Regions:
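Short, Lys/Arg-enriched N-terminal segments with co-localized hydrophobic residues
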Residues: 1-4
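Compact, Lys/Arg-rich rRNA/RNP-binding cores from ribosome-related proteins
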Residues: 7-156
Length: 156
């Protein structure tokens, strides 16, 4: 059979979720009005939705199964162009918020919670890993460091 790589931090093989259909133009039932789609993305972004949520809303309520087939670029790119979105890339921000949650939990009388202690270590490893990638891409300053005590300031 096919040799599958293991999942990160698990002893399981990775069996992927759903895969998108291979198409290179938007289906005829979909909304292909590029201006309207772009405006929707900007509006939803201003309303504070994450790019993942925006994609789901566009898919479920506005008949846009795939923004890239309509606009030729990603939702995150559109948001960045209209300078909406945080200082940090979204995936990294989500991990940082998760880390803050675990730190709060461990700090409020649960310092012996070993499973979550490990969860925090894993989350922080993922943050550092992403940070290295974003530094190489030039989306983070090269002197940026992950510091647990400064994390709250970064997230807010």
């Amino acid at each position: 059979g096919v040799v599958l790589m293991a999942r990160m931090y698990k002893s399981r093989k990775g069996k992927s979720g759903s895969s998108k259909p291979y198409v290179d133009e938007a289906p005829e039932w979909s909304n292909t009005d590029a201006k309207a789609v772009k405006n929707l993305i900007v509006e939803l972004g201003k309303a504070g939705h994450s790019s993942a949520m925006i994609g789901t809303i566009l898919r479920d309520q506005h008949a846009v199964p795939n923004v890239r087939l309509v606009l030729g670029k990603r939702i995150a790119t559109v948001l960045a162009e209209s300078s909406i979105g945080g200082t940090y890339p979204e995936d990294m921000m989500n991990l940082m918020q998760r880390a803050v949650g675990i730190i709060n939990h461990l700090g409020s009388g649960n310092h012996k919670d070993l499973h979550n202690k490990r969860g925090l270590e894993i989350t922080e490893a993922k943050i550092r890993r992403l940070a290295n990638y974003y530094k190489a891409e030039g989306r983070l300053p090269s002197e940026w460091r992950y510091k647990r005590d400064e994390l709250r300031l970064m997230v807010e």
